[in-house]
């Protein structure tokens, strides 16, 4: 895990094997006779999941003044209540330490896997135009990596898909 990743969001525990299985080229198992397999994901469902994931980064990467209630509401539209609270808490902690985010991170989605009401998005995110900055001066303290491996778990809830967990598995992407 890069130092940048751990400073930006300390979010979640591991989803063991999620990234490895997302990158597997093994075809899905055929259900035994008499069992009904879930229908394959529709392109529109993949697009919806990927759209929520991209919006999560747009909303959660708050670089302005102290996040307001409107920001928290926008965050809850794309993230679970638990993750929204973790992100908001981390943003407040950074502010109290004289740090803020700057720039933008650019998702480069490399895969989406849907399993019922759960989806895993793998990303080789470009953070080279973003990082942590001094809150008073705006002077960057660091810059993110151009190829940052990210694994996001989304859950289907009433109202649509929400990002539930963000992980930084490390390694090349």
Walk through the language-model features, giving the residues of each.
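Extreme N-terminal export signal peptides that direct proteins to the secretory pathway
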Residues: 17, 31-35
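Bacterial signal peptide processing site
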Residues: 24-27
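C-terminal motif of bacterial Sec signal peptides marking the signal peptidase cleavage site
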Residues: 19-22
């Amino acid at each position: 895990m890069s130092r940048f990743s751990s400073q930006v969001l300390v979010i979640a525990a591991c989803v063991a094997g999620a990234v490895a299985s997302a990158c597997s080229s093994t075809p899905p198992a055929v259900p035994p006779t008499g069992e009904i397999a879930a229908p394959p994901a529709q392109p529109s469902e993949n697009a919806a999941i990927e759209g929520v994931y991209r919006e999560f980064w747009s909303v959660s990467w708050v670089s302005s003044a102290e996040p307001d209630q409107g920001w928290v509401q926008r965050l809850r539209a794309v993230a679970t209540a638990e993750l929204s609270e973790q992100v908001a808490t981390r943003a407040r902690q950074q502010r109290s330490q004289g740090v803020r985010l700057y720039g933008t991170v650019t998702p480069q989605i490399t895969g989406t896997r849907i399993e019922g009401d759960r989806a895993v998005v793998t990303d080789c995110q470009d953070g080279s135009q973003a990082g942590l900055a001094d809150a008073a001066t705006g002077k960057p303290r660091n810059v993110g990596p151009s190829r940052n491996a990210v694994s996001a778990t989304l859950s289907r809830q009433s109202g649509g898909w929400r990002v539930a967990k963000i992980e930084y598995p490390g390694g090349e992407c």
